[in-house]
Amino acid sequence: MLDASEEGENLRTDEILGLSKLLWLAGNETTTNLISNGVVFLLNHPDVLADLRNDRTLIPDFVEEMLRYDGPVMGLFRTATRNVEFRGKNINKGDTLWLLFSSGNLDADTYEAPETFDLHRRNKDHLALGKGIHFCMGSALARLEAKVAFEWLVDLLPHMKLDFENGKRIPVPILSGWVKLPMSVDVGALEV
């Protein structure tokens, strides 16, 4: 980033800091939240956990459906680049908009039974990783990290207990995940 330039101009310090913060947040926070949301889901849905334990080839499908069903990012802010009317409402150039990916991921016009988690859902498209020029540049790494984590976790989860009463959700409406989620593992029951 220090050497990057466009039309002979280098990035400013504030742009470098902003991009660095984005890379850190997007590359860590979101994958962590995807995995923690998936752990909570699997502990609350032992039938899905059993399916994954019996057929690990379903883990990539599980990751995609988790991204759609309870993704780590609820939405992001965007700035309108021009005046536009949308469904009878005026949006002015410069207005700040909050795009709710999570709402789009539950669109009944796009998904059959959108509020139901479906491990075998045929339409695997979702907005959790953005679209177009705003598509997550770390999406392949995030998917791989989640896949590897769940390949290991499906054997550990039957021996885990979460302490929801002492857990704490992320208090920021943009993100979906946990700040704190205490757990215990019955290590004596684990196969080494």
Task: Indicate where each model-derived feature is located.
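Cytochrome P450
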Residues: 1-192
